[in-house]
């Protein structure tokens, strides 16, 4: 169904591309906080995953709108079919693995920091109680 509608495919591609761009922008804006927390490897993996996903959907838009202008419609359709049948799997796999790895590294690091803060708060509360 989606495959039969260029407008629907383009809408999905653009939506995914916009979400990836917004997420990358958000990661970039908060990169210093990630660096301060020691979670830069996680940030980098998330950026790679989002970029891979974005590049795939950008290539899909290229095969839908630019390639037909440069070659025949049949060649463009064959390229789009090749993109979806042969290249979508590795791109999705790389994207998901990088996003999962990035989230795992980042959440592990941030949970360690939360644990440190909780212990520090508890220690401080104990010291305040003893000093009263």
What are the residue ranges of the model-derived segments?
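N-terminal membrane insertion elements
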Residues: 2-127
């Amino acid at each position: 169904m989606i495959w039969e509608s260029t407008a629907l495919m383009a809408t999905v591609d653009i939506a995914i591309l916009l979400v990836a761009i917004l997420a990358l922008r958000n990661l970039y804006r908060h990169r210093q906080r990630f660096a301060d927390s020691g979670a830069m490897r996680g940030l980098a993996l998330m950026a790679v995953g989002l970029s891979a996903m974005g590049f795939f959907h950008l290539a899909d838009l290229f095969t839908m709108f630019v390639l037909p202008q440069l070659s025949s419609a049949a060649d463009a359709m064959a390229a789009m079919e090749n993109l979806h049948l042969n290249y979508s799997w590795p791109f999705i796999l790389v994207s998901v693995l990088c996003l999962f790895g990035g989230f795992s590294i980042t959440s592990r690091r941030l949970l360690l920091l939360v644990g440190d803060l909780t212990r520090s708060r508890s220690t401080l509360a104990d010291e305040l109680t003893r000093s009263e």
